[in-house]
A protein has these predicted regions:
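Short, P/G- and charge-enriched loop/turn segments at secondary-structure junctions
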Residues: 81-88, 134-138, 217-221, 245-249
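Conserved beta strand-loop-helix elements of the APE1-like EEP
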Residues: 50-53, 77, 87-107, 152, ...
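Catalytic metal-binding/acid-base residues of hydrolase active sites
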Residues: 33, 63-64, 103, 162-164, ...
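Beta-strand-turn-beta hairpins that frame and shape the catalytic cleft
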Residues: 92-110, 116-125, 141-160, 262-264
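N-terminal, active-site-proximal structural segment of metallo-dependent hydrolase catalytic domains
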Residues: 1-93, 171-176, 250, 264
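Metal-dependent phosphoester-hydrolase catalytic domains
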Residues: 109, 167-193, 198-264
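Acidic/histidine-rich helix-loop elements
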Residues: 1-13, 74, 120-140, 164
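Active-site beta-loop-alpha substructure in enzyme catalytic cores
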Residues: 144-148, 153-183
Length: 264
């Protein structure tokens, strides 16, 4: 699908160019493929790592197969995590990933479950009459959700997730994730940063909690953002300890990227 401003459609070259332009040390990516035919059998998070010059990366599958086509939940024989320093084998799958230039000391995974029911979801589709994708509603079954975390040698643990689009279910998942993030932070003596597509509008991710949203910016759709679904949450960073990175469309995602620079 053509995503403005990229008029040539998705490609590995476009991915490398977009990731390199972000000039980031750590990236958390959602909705990525691992050895799936629809993306030419590419390990997308490894390609992301290559584009940004990162050694460490990990992919955590949500499902085996392709969403919206044929997929199944993971079973006991499926690897829960594939990283740059592992030799595990995994069938074509879909999930989330992290790539980091900063050394990763330990990877973590948390299962968040899924909604037993789906719901109509607004998604971008090809348009025959416009260079901008059209928006339409389709009924979508919710896939299993999870969180992937990387404990870094710089004193931070980065948490990545893609929560359910079903109201209420996503709030329950976020509550569980926040609790886990604080536990991991305490165990590793690191500061937690929670990143990802939370499928929740502004203020809801931090309501009635000690967490704060470091970036308040509409992120979806990327060619004319009307709502914020993507966040960077912290339970302890002060405004003078970070600055917000510039935001611009990448042409490879229907979401805008957000980022912060930690000030030392």
């Amino acid at each position: 699908m053509e995503i403005p401003p990229n008029k040539s459609g998705p490609s590995l070259a476009a991915l490398h160019k977009a990731i390199a332009a972000l000039a980031t040390d750590v990236i958390a990516v959602q909705e990525i493929d691992f050895n799936l035919p629809r993306s030419s059998g590419v390990n997308q998070i490894a390609e992301v790592a290559s584009a940004m010059g990162a050694r460490d990366w990990a992919f955590a599958p949500s499902v085996i197969g392709t969403p919206d086509e044929k997929w199944r939940k993971l079973n006991d024989g499926d690897a829960r995590l594939i990283a740059n320093d592992t030799n595990q084998i995994l069938a074509g799958s879909y999930g989330i990933g992290i790539a980091s230039k900063i050394k990763v000391l330990k990877w973590h995974r948390l299962e968040l479950g899924n909604s037993p029911i789906g719901m109509p979801l607004v998604v971008p589709t090809e348009s025959e009459t416009s260079s901008r994708p059209k928006i339409r509603a389709i009924y979508v079954h919710d896939e299993p959700r999870l969180a992937l975390a990387a404990t870094l040698e710089n004193g931070f643990t980065i948490f990545n997730t893609h929560l359910s689009f079903v109201p209420g279910v996503n709030l329950s998942q976020l509550k569980k994730l926040k609790k886990w993030a604080l536990e991991i932070g305490e165990e590793t003596n690191t500061k937690a940063l929670l990143l990802g597509d939370l499928n929740l509008p502004k203020k809801l991710p931090v309501a009635l909690s000690k967490w704060s949203s470091l970036v308040t910016q509409n992120t979806y759709p990327s060619w004319g953002a009307k709502v914020q679904f993507d966040y960077i949450l912290s339970d302890r960073l002060r405004p003078d300890e970070y600055k917000i990175s510039p935001i611009s469309p990448t042409g490879i995602s229907d979401h805008l990227p957000i980022g912060v620079e930690i000030l030392r």
